[in-house]
């Protein structure tokens, strides 16, 4: 666990980023009110460069407002457990928190509505909601017609391919596939002399679920019907299992039954596989010649047909004893100027203006593809509070099907049965 506190007395310390970017952030903070000077905000966040950037820029917020900001950074699972316990117990140990959108329906009853911050908090920046891809904003931040979060980290799956391998196989190295069938067609041409066509994870891990979700969406699948009943063994569900087992796995390396993200990344970065899915956060290593053998050979685009939305938002604890100060902070942290600055020091913007910014694109060339993915057809994780449990059911059944322990049809049927049983136990289904 990491804990970092910034107070007015610490604001003069040096920190990451150039003096130019700090001056930029200070200009953005100059008009903030000192109404809440002396109060303290505790923020719960995950770990990684993007969350470190949030803590770093907060020094300027403290300097401008006199509000101390303390960040507590935990791993994904630890953060989830800590957040749910804090909210449901009413302890209000944290005033603001980053959350994955998969959790939003579980935490919504405990979140403040952020829609009217500029009217409620004098001097708060405008939320500029039209500067976000609207479908992404809806998924990231809204639950039950309530704006409970403002995006703090934009993330969406991207398709990557080895241009040199494409060229050797007679494929256009500059053209991305438009459909999953085309991915497999190209993958078959890439299979040669120890090289494979796609780095498909089939282990009992989240990236297997990610792959299933994207293909399921491309097949026209929906998690639930109009009555709320699960439809994982629908025609689309069966087609998805068959596609993964009979087509995508067929052009992927052997031994992938234990794969998750590290193995997927390694297969692509060593040249073993010529195509893969990739999260934007991995591009720093993928384009680094010290960590990737294909650093100068990679092309990228949004996923064919639909990209899966990842990412995080920041919410305000409705029980916070410093709720107004917390709302001011969240509005400031997610304002366009501050988002841009965070992008320069490790942040992952979700705002359109930042993803189009020439300086930010120079730093991370994949940002236009991230924006295209966010603005395109996006898949999302199952929109129920127990989404994490459903993810486990999905990757268990995909793993069994790829291992030939079950037929694709049986795996789809068993997945449906597991989800139905789970939803009955949790009260979603009455019959």
Swiss-Prot record:
Keywords: Periplasm, Plasmid, Signal, Transport. SUPFAM superfamilies: Periplasmic binding protein-like II. Residues 1-25 form the signal peptide. GO terms for cellular component: periplasmic space. It is found in: Periplasm. Belongs to the bacterial solute-binding protein 1 family. Probably part of the binding-protein-dependent transport system y4oPQRS. This system probably transports a sugar-like molecule. PANTHER family: ABC TRANSPORTER PERIPLASMIC-BINDING PROTEIN YCJN-RELATED (PTHR43649:SF34), ARABINOSE-BINDING PROTEIN-RELATED (PTHR43649). This is Probable amino-acid ABC transporter periplasmic-binding protein y4oP. It comes from Sinorhizobium fredii (strain NBRC 101917 / NGR234).
